[in-house]
Amino acid sequence: MNQVQTLTGPHIRTANTTRNIMLHVAISLMPALLGSIYFFGIRSLYITGFSVTVCVLTEYFWQKITKKPVTANDFSAVVTGILLAFNMPVTVPLWVVALSGIFSILVVKQMFGGIGCNFVNPALMGRLFTMVVWPGAVMQYVAPRTLTTTGFDAVSSATVLGTVKNGGEAGYSYLQMFLGETPGALGETSKLLLLVGFAYMCFMGIVNAEAALTYIATVIILTFIFGPAGLFTGDILLNLFGGGLILGACYMLTDYAFASRRGRLLYAVTAGIITAAIRIFSFYPEGICFGILTANCLGGALSLLYK
């Protein structure tokens, strides 16, 4: 019987070791981390460091207790910890970060066999876990520091997509959305810095950009066609830069190891359709988490159809 294996995104097409690959992914996330410190203050670094520590220690102690080979030094838990923090607002309590990290590593990753065996993205599942259990802790955002201000605004506010979804004005230019001068989670606001990191991964040859681009294209095309004021009235740049689409596409989209290009693209399109449908038809402004996780769950069936 053929074996179907999954890897936590980004999808790797190289003979490098897991440790080297994950090290490069972690390095690629550093521009966005530095950006989060600039936009939201030093607490961004504390949250990220704490999240990484919890994830690494959870993996280490679980593998020690279960007498499995210790892989806590392969940087995969580090990447999960960074991405988990990137999905949190700067105001999130540290105990929420801790419980989310334990859930991501222990339940989602290790109980399914560890890296390469978990069928959904651990960081995204950790995000979903906190959204369901403590929504108030992870869905309250603050306005960041900008080029014309000296610090972030501690008053809670909605994301740009959330504001527009509720009938308000975006309040930010497309350039501000691209640079990161908008309310949002720590690592999702600066599309520029995320793309710098993604370009680094592409340059190093450790990521397949085709699935990410297909996912992005699917979302922006569908949200443009089925716009809020009728057909072909959607705001392409708002949907591209106003939320977590870039972070989701570049770092969260788990790409199954399809042998065929068709299967890989269908997987990305599936995630894009679900994400767009949630943005268009539900009361949730984002849809990234639900879209990618649903596609993760369907990935096994798709991989059997398109080997």
Give residue ranges: language-model regions.
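N-terminal signal-anchor module of multipass membrane proteins
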Residues: 1-56
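Long hydrophobic alpha-helical segments that form multi-pass transmembrane helix bundles
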Residues: 116-195
